Amino acid sequence: MMTFISCAKTMTGRSKMQTPVTSTPQFQTEAIQNALDMSQFSAEELERLLRVNSKIAAENYMRFQDFCSDSPSALAALLAYTGIVYKRIHPQDFTPEDFQYAQDHLRITSFLYGLLRPLDQIKNYRMEGDIKLPERGGISMFDYWKPILTDTFIKEIKARGGILINLASGEMKDLFDWKRVEQEVQVITPEFQVWKKGKLTTVVVYAKMCRGELTRFIIKNRIENPGDLKGFKWEGFSFDAGHSTDTHYLFSLLS
């Protein structure tokens, strides 16, 4: 069984924690070229392309300018990303065995790096999937990565029993030929919703928290059977058998 999650927009380049081992991203060469291409844009252009304010644009302009230098140093992906999902995974208390299990069974999508393992060393960046780089033929990052990642992704899932737990955001499917993925492996997508006035509603912050907590649950408990996910409970969220299917696991909360 393999789990995959999305990258986060917020990142840090520092951590007091040391991972037991480190690894190099599989698509490091492509990531470096992508970063070099991004370094050609001005801060004003990045503000528009990334849809951010001028401060964040200036910060990422400098990140891309310094990407190929020795400073800042790289950090393991699971520690570098600091979004809500990653805060809830909380790798700061992982044992070496937890990190190794995550390295073997968790994958992280990235518009810059393509597909990452948790201990892959990465640098801070900001990227969007719809950005079109001239050096990449003017196609979006979604279309650039799709033919590169699909076969690798399917092969890795099959090597881990042919079951994928999809905890990534919806847009990340566009990095792959998702129709092929669903044809060749079993995809199970957990969702997290709240009952409000008799209707199920998605509260984004809760959904992100639960994705992180479920990822942590999988890693800490070495989950290999998707049926064991049904035992996940967190802050009132629990498996809702009446609104779940073989490919869609709903965890609901009574508000």
From Swiss-Prot:
Organism this protein belongs to: Phocaeicola vulgatus (strain ATCC 8482 / DSM 1447 / JCM 5826 / CCUG 4940 / NBRC 14291 / NCTC 11154) (Bacteroides vulgatus)
Gene Ontology process terms (BP): response to hydroperoxide
Protein's name according to its UniProt entry: UPF0246 protein BVU_0413
Lineage, highest ranks first: Bacteria, Pseudomonadati, Bacteroidota, Bacteroidia, Bacteroidales
Family, as annotated: Belongs to the UPF0246 family.
Gene Ontology CC: one annotated term: cytosol
Pfam families xref list: H2O2_YaaD
HAMAP family the record matches: UPF0246 (MF_00652)
Top-level taxon of origin: Bacteria
Disulfides per UniProt: none
